[in-house]
A protein has these predicted regions:
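Compositionally biased terminal segments of proteins
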Residues: 1-147
Length: 147
């Protein structure tokens, strides 16, 4: 398992994160997961993604504060990337109803991609949601899938 860490206020720390917590590190061997330091260009996210992050702070974080990208923004980023592993992840998010296609389609215009890429992204979301519906998974508000 991996975790991407983006040091928002200090992007130059991404390499240090990779070295200390990256794949094959002592941290990875000890805890069974690793972290990759990422920068602002690693993921394509909707313009307003920072308004939807989730704050994480508790005893497990030694009361340090971290923010997690909202699942809708994560889905869109992975759908734009379009790799096989991203498709599988996105399909699981749809199947288990962590996201809905209307919710996703509403955010497509805020993606910093070309109009043509936005059209392709909308088609991909509809295709994936329709394939989930067609194998028997409940897709709420799925009327738009047959258009």
């Amino acid at each position: 398992m991996e975790v991407d860490i983006y040091p928002l206020r200090s992007p130059d720390l991404a390499d240090a994160i990779e070295g200390a917590l990256g794949e094959g590190s002592l941290f990875h061997k000890t805890h069974g997961y690793y972290a990759q330091g990422v920068g602002p260009g690693t993921a394509i996210l909707p313009k307003d993604w920072l308004t939807r992050v989730h704050r994480v702070q508790n005893g497990n974080t030694n009361d340090r504060i971290g923010y997690c990208v909202d699942v809708v923004d994560l889905f869109l980023s992975k759908a734009v990337a379009g790799r096989d592993k991203d498709r599988e992840f996105c399909m699981a998010l749809l199947e288990h109803r962590y996201v809905s296609s209307p919710q996703l389609l509403e955010l497509v215009p805020s993606m910093p991609i070309t109009n043509e890429e936005q059209r392709a992204l909308r088609a991909r979301i509809r295709r994936w949601a329709k394939s989930q519906r067609d194998v028997g998974h409940d897709m709420p508000n799925a009327q738009h899938l047959d258009k």
